[in-house]
């Protein structure tokens, strides 16, 4: 039996552990630096069909219907003209059970956590050293404890310390010249939008998204605002909890986004957006990286959670097939999604009136062009 150690108890780490527990050839444990799994309620995530199909293999379809929502389309709105541009039918990629799903992040994390016996999740385990010169990898933690494993899977987020340790250099994501504002809002406080689907609002150097996260009228709101920050501001993470900074950011957003939405947001959080600039692959064939530690995407194709699940599943299949590392197709696919996400960001944030007019005109045509949709969206949703 091979021992597998997973560093990080987020979506990718928990899902990977759930898969490995299906195979009696592996003994798996999770090591989380925090004192608990983050089960904070409220904030939403989107899961496209490519990840829902994989989650359903471990029983995701059995989650209480009330805790999920199944939007059929994305409605695009112009913040400048306060009008609808067009809509994209995302249900075209659905099957009977594999449907585009929105839900609270808590719901997914709780589902995955309950797949893992509590004694297999170890908390307060901050990695300070990785020794991997031999077939057996040794991991040393800050509390002076250590473990040995046959396979080490790193899934401790975009700012993965473990990834930097095995690379013998600091690997950090780059600031995307944007900040995000996230919050919750009730259906009763959302006027003049389709409550049964995803609403995407395009503005000047700004876009925002509103979508239901369950069947009970709760919605997730997120806005991405272009904003340059200097190195001192980025180093001072308390800045994003500063009431004055958050208020000024909300004021900036309210210049374009419906003030009624901004004024009725709850549980507001503000944070900088970071993205990956490279894909780092360990030289040691027994060490793997998944989730945001593998690659962090811009938040403009709603693929963060879906790709974490997809990459973990591919690694599991590689384990079963005896492959050492992700193949070239995975690298190619990651770069393709990254390019499209960056292109979306560029197009969503147009300021020039002529460019906005041309964009809106093209969008109305392209969302009805099946060949384009199958190429641009289908290549991601239909893995």
What are these regions (language model features)?
Residues 21-41:
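Glycine-rich FAD pyrophosphate-binding loop
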Residues 86-100, 104-109, 189-267:
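Conserved FAD/dinucleotide-binding core of flavoprotein oxidoreductases
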Residues 3, 26-27, 218-221:
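Residues at the starts of beta-strands that form the adenosine-phosphate
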Residues 12, 36, 159:
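Conserved Rossmann-like nucleotide-cofactor binding loop
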Residues 363-383:
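C-terminal auxiliary extensions adjacent to catalytic cores
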Residues 5-23, 153, 181, 245, ...:
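Conserved mid-domain beta->alpha element of the FAD-binding
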Residues 36-54:
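Conserved N-terminal glycine-rich FAD pyrophosphate-binding loop of Rossmann-like flavoproteins
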Residues 2-4, 21, 48-186, 228-233, ...:
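Conserved N-terminal helical subregion
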């Amino acid at each position: 039996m091979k021992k597998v150690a997973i560093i990080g108890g987020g979506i990718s780490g928990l899902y990977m552990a759930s898969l490995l527990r299906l195979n009696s050839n592996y003994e798996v444990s999770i090591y989380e630096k925090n004192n608990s799994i983050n089960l904070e309620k409220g904030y939403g995530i989107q899961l496209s069909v490519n990840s829902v199909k994989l989650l359903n293999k471990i029983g995701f379809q059995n989650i209480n219907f009330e805790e999920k929502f199944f939007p059929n389309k994305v409605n695009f709105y112009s913040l400048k003209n306060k009008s609808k541009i067009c809509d994209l039918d995302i249900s075209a990629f659905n099957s009977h059970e594999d449907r585009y799903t929105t839900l609270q992040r808590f719901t997914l994390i709780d589902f995955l956590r309950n797949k893992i016996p509590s004694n297999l999740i170890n908390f307060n385990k901050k990695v300070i050293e990785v020794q991997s010169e031999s077939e057996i990898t040794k991991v040393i933690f800050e509390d002076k404890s250590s473990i040995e494993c046959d396979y080490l899977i790193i899934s401790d987020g975009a700012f993965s310390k473990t990834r930097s340790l095995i690379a013998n250099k600091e690997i950090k994501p780059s600031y995307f010249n944007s900040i995000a504002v996230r919050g919750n809002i009730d259906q009763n406080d959302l006027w003049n939008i389709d409550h049964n689907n995803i609403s995407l609002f395009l503005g000047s150097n700004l876009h925002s998204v509103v979508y239901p996260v369950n069947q009970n009228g709760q919605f997730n709101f997120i806005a991405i605002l272009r904003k340059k920050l200097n190195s001192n501001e980025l180093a001072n993470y308390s800045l994003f909890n500063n009431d004055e900074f958050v208020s000024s950011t909300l004021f900036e957003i309210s210049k374009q986004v419906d003030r009624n939405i901004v004024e009725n947001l709850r549980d507001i959080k503000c944070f900088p957006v970071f993205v990956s600039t490279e894909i780092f692959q360990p030289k040691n064939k027994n060490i793997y990286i998944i989730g945001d530690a593998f690659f962090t995407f811009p938040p403009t194709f709603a693929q963060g959670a879906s790709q974490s699940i997809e990459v973990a599943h591919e690694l599991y299949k590689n384990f079963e097939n005896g492959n050492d590392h992700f193949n070239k197709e995975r690298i190619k696919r990651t770069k393709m999604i990254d390019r499209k996400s960056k292109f979306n960001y560029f197009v969503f944030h147009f300021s020039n009136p002529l460019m906005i007019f041309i964009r809106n005109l093209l969008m109305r045509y392209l969302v009805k062009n099946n060949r384009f949709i199958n190429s641009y969206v289908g290549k991601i949703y239909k893995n």
